[in-house]
């Protein structure tokens, strides 16, 4: 089944909310970008992207006009991984405004994600410097005696902070 989307247009801004997975038949790839100056994509409900979805994303994103700003919100871990591993996945004009970071509780084995926002928990690099990430401390999992920790290898998950410099 194709990923359902909700598309809204207001003047020269297109907002797309994705739901499910990004695959071969995702209607995202059919969104018209004619006269669009800003493209906002909400990925909060995306659960994964398959290999054909990756290929189609790259082909589709090459057609985004260079002067069109692209903002990605709540990018899920599966997509962050692709951004870090696949050259050309994230267009130069794109900015990840927020990402979902996996967390794990060693005490009760509970898994969850936390949303990190650009300018709060992570910063993009400037003037040749690498970006930075600041993790919240003492993140409770819901039980008094339990505390979450990030469930990622920081050097791999936040690799995009080293190479992505939006135009």
Question: In which residue ranges do the predicted regions lie?
Answer:
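Short beta-strand/loop segment at the start of cytosolic alpha/beta domains
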Residues: 1-15
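Cys/His-clustered metal-coordination modules, chiefly Zn-binding fingers
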Residues: 84-167
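Acidic/polar residues at beta-strand termini and the immediately following turn/coil
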Residues: 8-10, 42, 104-105
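Amphipathic alpha-helical interaction surfaces in cytosolic regulatory modules
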Residues: 13-97
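Arginine residue identity/basic-tract feature
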Residues: 6-9, 35, 62, 114, ...
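Surface-exposed beta-strand edges and flanking loops
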Residues: 7, 18, 74, 152-154
């Amino acid at each position: 089944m194709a990923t359902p989307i909700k598309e809204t247009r207001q003047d020269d801004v297109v907002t797309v909310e994705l739901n499910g997975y990004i695959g071969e038949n995702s209607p995202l790839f059919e969104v018209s970008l004619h006269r669009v100056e800003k493209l906002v994509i909400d990925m909060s409900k995306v659960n994964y992207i398959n290999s054909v979805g990756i290929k189609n994303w790259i082909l589709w994103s090459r057609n985004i006009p260079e002067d069109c700003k692209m903002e990605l919100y709540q990018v899920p871990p599966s997509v962050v991984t692709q951004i870090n591993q696949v050259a050309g996945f994230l267009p130069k004009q794109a900015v990840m405004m927020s990402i979902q970071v996996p967390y794990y509780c060693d005490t009760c084995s509970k898994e969850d994600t936390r949303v990190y926002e650009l300018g709060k928990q992570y910063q993009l690099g400037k003037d040749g410097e690498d970006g930075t990430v600041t993790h919240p401390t003492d993140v409770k999992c819901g039980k008094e005696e339990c505390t979450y920790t990030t469930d990622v290898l920081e050097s791999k998950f936040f690799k995009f902070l080293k190479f992505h410099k939006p135009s």
